[in-house]
Amino acid sequence: MSSTKAPVPPTQAEIQQIQDQLIKARDAFQVHETELQKLSASRSKLLTQLNENEMVKKEFDLLESEAKIYKLNGPVLFKQTKEEAENTITSRLDIINNNLKTIETNFKDIEKKAMEQRNKIFEYQNKIRSLTAPPPPQAQ
């Protein structure tokens, strides 16, 4: 005669502890999702700026070296040499590209953290399901 022990049902405290962990993981996931949305919006803005500045650079390439270029600063137009204007655009493009690289790196890091939290959420949900599921019928 073999003695099979029935599984010990989980206590309400154990289930509550897992639910608390689930809530913490969900909250962390939501924070990461919000950060990803902000980074995505920043990336879109930078891509627009990059496109605009690249178009300006192409326009400068078409100009003669002695062309008159004016820079708008508030309500006043200031005369600029082509070289100064090209240097300004080049430095803007460098800054934008560096910012894009930073955003891409941050996006990947946060996306990885969000996936880890999502996996934890699934893990906790499965634990809760397995603990609260009715026991299988006993074979006789």
UniProtKB/Swiss-Prot annotation:
GO cellular component, one term: prefoldin complex
Keyword Chaperone recorded: yes
InterPro entries the record matches: PFD_beta-like, Prefoldin
Keyword presence, Chaperone: yes
Biological role: Binds specifically to cytosolic chaperonin (c-CPN) and transfers target proteins to it. Binds to nascent polypeptide chain and promotes folding in an environment in which there are many competing pathways for nonnative proteins.
Subunit text: Heterohexamer of two PFD-alpha type and four PFD-beta type subunits.
Official protein name in the record: Probable prefoldin subunit 6
Species this protein is from: Dictyostelium discoideum
Phylogenetic lineage: Eukaryota, Amoebozoa, Evosea, Eumycetozoa, Dictyostelia
